[in-house]
């Protein structure tokens, strides 16, 4: 779902709200049913609709980032301390794939940035200078607000077998460095396809 600012709807479905807020559609339904998020039901149907104005009010009240609101684009956070890799990934993901990209150059900054931007996907280098990538993934998995965030391991040192072993232990995919543009985009698409 891509929505540009000029095409932004006045009323959104629970699925659209879920994608913007990076939560499951059932979470949006719970917000609606509890009265936390104001909207209305389609007469004769169980379908719910959320006016854009109410969603913005809700997001501001709960400190949610509004950056996903205008585009509905997939939000990707790159966590890597190698500047050349970050630069290439950022250029590819923003320019070619039209993703919204945030960058964190340390495990510490990854926590702060993830909390603020609530990415759909985190591309996580396993060999950060300040912390092991597994610890960052563990922190993401323990944060209730990031339960739907997909974590993709990146490494040039680990073997294919070691990287595959990470699947199911907090990671949703992996990229072996060096990788090409198609591999990066395909891995992100594969990881997000299950949820969205």
Residue ranges, per PLM feature:
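Acidic catalytic/metal-coordinating carboxylates
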Residues: 106, 132-138
């Amino acid at each position: 779902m891509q929505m540009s600012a000029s095409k932004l709807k006045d009323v959104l479905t629970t699925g659209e709200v879920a994608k913007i807020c990076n939560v499951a559609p059932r979470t949006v339904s719970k917000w609606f049913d509890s009265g936390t998020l104001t909207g209305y039901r389609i007469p004769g149907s169980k379908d719910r609709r959320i006016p854009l104005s109410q969603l913005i009010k809700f997001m501001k009240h709960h400190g949610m980032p509004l950056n996903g609101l205008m585009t509905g684009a997939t939000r990707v956070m790159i966590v890597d301390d190698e500047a050349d890799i970050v630069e290439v990934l950022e250029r590819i993901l923003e320019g070619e794939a039209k993703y919204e990209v945030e960058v964190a150059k340390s495990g510490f900054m990854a926590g702060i940035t993830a909390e603020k931007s609530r990415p759909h996907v985190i591309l996580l280098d396993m060999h950060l200078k300040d912390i092991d990538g597994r610890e960052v993934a563990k922190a993401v998995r323990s944060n209730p607000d990031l339960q739907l965030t997909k974590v993709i391991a990146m490494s040039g040192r680990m073997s294919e077998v070691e990287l595959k072993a990470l699947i199911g232990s907090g990671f949703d995919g992996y990229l072996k460095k060096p990788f090409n543009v198609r591999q990066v985009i395909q891995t992100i698409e594969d990881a997000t396809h299950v949820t969205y």
